[in-house]
């Protein structure tokens, strides 16, 4: 760079735009995969009911794993419009609706765990064996325990399922059900709609691949070699 003669070439090199890497696919489960995974905990045991309620809440609310870990008993608001109060990044709170089945699980869980006392409203909603608030790692471990049984039912279930894949799955399922990106943005707590648009891009690509796999392409893209057509060449020459 100290030689003026090489400066022009150096400028050309740094002016070459970087190759844009393709956007990675959003890792998520299909509705069938999610349904099978959520059905794995043993409903006949206290631990199984706790795990099922935890995973169903994670999926139904589309919350981040830390938001799930931070839930307090008071954050489950029942009534005519049942909602879950989530505390996200920067301490910002948002309310997401609870569907009927998820609400029923939470209500039974709160009663079974004796958390329905007024003085327990600030208790952590989900705790470990030591009655301490579950950590992100603890939640990840709980989910991992049910992957192998789920794969025995449906081998297509991924070998690794993370808590964040529950959030991705909920967003994709909402989008595929026709819910607008604006609502999904607010539901997930995104500040920028561009963050939410990754789901739309992923869904479009999945549809394209599905169409390619399902239907033969009937359009023949091969064109005749016009350079061998003498009459066409004569006509083109006459246009000069």
Predicted regions and their residues:
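Conserved catalytic core of the tyrosine transesterase superfamily
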Residues: 1-240
């Amino acid at each position: 760079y100290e030689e003026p003669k090489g400066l022009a070439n150096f400028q050309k090199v740094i002016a070459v735009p970087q190759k844009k890497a393709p956007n990675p696919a959003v890792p998520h489960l299909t509705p069938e995969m999610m349904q099978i995974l959520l059905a794995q905990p043993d409903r006949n045991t206290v631990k199984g009911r706790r795990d099922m309620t935890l995973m169903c809440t994670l999926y139904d609310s589309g919350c981040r794993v830390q938001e799930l870990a931070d839930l307090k008993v008071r954050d489950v608001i029942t009534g005519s419009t049942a909602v879950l109060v989530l505390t996200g990044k920067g301490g910002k709170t948002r309310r997401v609706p609870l569907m009927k089945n998820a609400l029923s699980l939470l209500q039974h869980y709160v009663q079974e765990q004796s958390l329905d006392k007024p003085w327990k409203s600030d208790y952590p909603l989900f705790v470990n064996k030591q009655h301490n608030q579950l950590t992100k790692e603890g939640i990840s471990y709980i989910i991992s325990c049910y992957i192998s049984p789920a794969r025995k039912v449906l081998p297509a279930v991924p070998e690794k399922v993370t808590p964040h894949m529950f959030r991705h799955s909920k967003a994709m399922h909402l989008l595929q059900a026709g819910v607008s990106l604006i609502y999904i943005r607010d539901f997930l707590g995104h500040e920028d709609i561009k963050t939410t648009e990754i789901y739309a891009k992923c869904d479009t690509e999945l549809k394209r691949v599905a169409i390619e796999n399902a239907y033969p392409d009937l359009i023949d893209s091969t064109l005749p070699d016009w350079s061998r057509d003498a009459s066409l060449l004569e006509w083109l020459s006459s246009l000069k």
